[in-house]
Amino acid sequence: MQKIWRNEAVNGTKIDAWPTTIGGPPILIGSWAGKTWIPRAATEFDGWIASGARSTFDKLKEGIANYRAHGGKRAIVTNIKVDLDAPTGDMPDDGPFNLCCDLKTAQERFRRIVDLGYDEAIFVVPDHKTETLDRVLAITGK
C-alpha cells in the first residue's frame, strides 16, 4: 500500500493515486514489546502503538526504549483502563498498568508514562458522562 500511495509500481503494475491521496495516511504498528515489530514500526512506519491493557509498566518502559533506540518518532499507549472510583492500591512495575485509583495517584502514574516518552495516550473509561470525562481530563493536567 505504501508503494501505491507513493505512485510506485507494485508487481509490475502502477496505479496512479489521486493527487490528494499521494503519500497515504500515517501507518502505525500496534505491538507489545516484541523484537520484530517495534524496530519495524520505528524504521518503516509512522509510529508505534503499545497496549496498556496487557502490559506492565516494565514492558511499557522496555518497549519505548527499544522503539526510541531504533529512531522511532511517534509512540502511543492505548487501552489504559481508568476508574477513579476504584480503591487505590499498589501497582508494582511488573503488574498490570492501569489508572484504577484516586485522581492524585492516577496523575502520578500517568506522569510516569509521559516521562518514559510516550507522545499520546488513549484511555478506556467506565462511561462517557461529562463529569467522568472531566475527571479523566484532570489526570492529564489539561
Locations of the language-model features?
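Active-site-adjacent structural elements that line small-molecule/cofactor binding pockets in enzymes
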Residues: 1-142
